[in-house]
Amino acid sequence: MNAAARVAREREEWEDVCALDDVLPGTGVCAMVAGQQVALVRTASPDALYAIGNFDPFSKAFVLSRGIVGDRAGVPKIASPIYKQSFDLRTGECLDDARVRVPTYDVRVEQGRILVYREPRRIGTR
């Protein structure tokens, strides 16, 4: 595969979902990525961007993008707006029940646009 074909294939694996400015620091928004609801979460301090599954396994609702963004002992997290369980934004692990986790996605910013990798990360990878 030549270099141009590799670049084209990689572009297909990433979905352009919105402008970085569409996600204010300290908030989340929902985006559709490869047919799945993904919560894009931007922390305020430090300014960082994360992508996790939007489905809250405790309330059985697609609400995590509307959660409370913050940190717990330095761990960036989002708390479900329903029952308040917190999820590590880096790993998807529930900070209140380590047996539960939500999918996480690679995310990057290019020319002011947020791109999300179409497949969730495998557990144990970054």
Would you name each region that the model predicts?
Residues 1-75, 88-89, 101-126:
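N-terminal pre-ligand scaffold of iron-sulfur
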Residues 56, 80-83:
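Short cysteine clusters
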